[in-house]
Amino acid sequence: MRYFTAGESHGPRLTAIIEGVPAGLPLTADYINAELRRRQGGYGRGGRMKIESDQVEITSGVRHGLTMGSPITLNVTNRDFKNWTEIMSAADIEDKKKSIRKLTKPRPGHADLVGGMKYRFSDLRNSLERSSARETTMRVAVGSVAKRLLEELEITIASHVVVLGGIEVDVPENLTVAEIKERASQSEISVVNQEHEQEIKDYIDQIKKEGNTIGGIIETVVGGVPVGLGSYVQWDRKLDAQIAQGVVSINAFKGVEFGLGFKDGYLKGSYVMDEITWSKEDGYRRKSNNLGGFEGGMTNGQPIVVRGVMKPIPTLYKPLMSVDIETHEPYKASVERSDPTAVPAAAVVMEGVVATVLATEILNKFSSDNMEELKEAVKSHQKFIKEF
């Protein structure tokens, strides 16, 4: 399975084309829209979310609620485009109009300046429009298709916020994926411990008044994953590496870890490694899950536990200093519509990205043209693993 996305933040629409989804997967626009609503929610979201009410249109690859095995095309209209029709026009317009909303004061931490240098733009809006987090709308849409496939294989996935603005959430031990999903869904900031809810929301309000932004850390957990996804035989076939690439490809994400992650650097091997057990009923298991469900770049049957860190949003309402690319004079950076934080919403994006990587690897290992064949292949593999 592979996909491409297209579209600008203030253009007419966003598009994704997905290839390789087996025929016979139940899929509806309502299911995708529910995921898009999750992305638009979360405490701390700003004005753009009041303008946009994302609704997907499926224009190919699905008929009568079932995928057809052909490329799936998803479109989401940008409602705000009506205010940007000339500014974002594909057709040439007069120079006077081109100067409207021209961006020449790049924002520190954003793609504005480097994108302008790379593609030789005199108007840095060209960098801003495609590099905007608005593109994550389609990452969620694509991820919802992947999640639908995982559900059919009884693979569950959930995400929650574990750190927001430096405030750490006390996460109860041994929560199931279903419990994480339920608890996070009841929180405006996607935390599983309500004791932190008001403290974090108050801090978000404070940050907004300051004209500042905050980042955080998100954890995604996947249960029911078959043993042996990924491979050790080549570097690029290691599944944890593929997930790491996917997570860090999300706008503003700067790091990723699995299981104990960076704590491994402070611990002894006798503590970190997960001891192996065997029983006739369950086959091979691990006593712990310090490695986050991976050994040798392959899934080992334990839940996948992956965390990603998101930096604070670079657009500040009290902007930092920058330089005008036309005059080379120091100026405060440009201000675009922004939020004090998007970490809760980014949890939905990360969940979709991890689901997409997993679905892709499943289809690589259990290559199937239709869902019936796929389910049979996975079931046969699971039987072999249990009897190994």
UniProtKB/Swiss-Prot annotation:
- Biological process terms in GO annotation: amino acid biosynthetic process; aromatic amino acid family biosynthetic process; chorismate biosynthetic process
* Keyword Transmembrane belongs to the record: no
The answer to keyword NADP applying to this record is: yes
Q: Which domain of life is it from?
A: Bacteria
Q: Per its record, how is this protein called by name? A: Chorismate synthase
CDD domains linked: Chorismate_synthase
* An example molecular function term from Gene Ontology annotations: FMN binding
Q: Which PANTHER family match?
A: CHORISMATE SYNTHASE (PTHR21085:SF0)
Q: Which reaction does it catalyse?
A: 5-O-(1-carboxyvinyl)-3-phosphoshikimate = chorismate + phosphate
Which family is it part of? Belongs to the chorismate synthase family.
Enumerate the residues binding NADP(+): 39, 45
Q: What are the UniProt keywords, alphabetically?
A: Amino-acid biosynthesis, Aromatic amino acid biosynthesis, FAD, Flavoprotein, FMN, Lyase, NADP
Which gene is annotated as encoding this protein in its UniProt record? aroC
**Annotated FMN binding sites:** 130-132, 251-252, 296, 311-315, 337
State whether it acts alone or in a complex, and with which partners, per the record: Homotetramer.
What are the record's GO terms for cellular component? Answer: cytosol
Which pathway does the record list? Metabolic intermediate biosynthesis; chorismate biosynthesis; chorismate from D-erythrose 4-phosphate and phosphoenolpyruvate: step 7/7
Q: Enumerate the cofactors the protein uses.
A: FMNH2
Q: How is the cofactor bound?
A: Reduced FMN (FMNH(2)).
The free-text function statement in the UniProt record for this protein reads: This reaction introduces a second double bond into the aromatic ring system.
Record-linked Pfam families: Chorismate_synt (PF01264)
EC id: 4.2.3.5
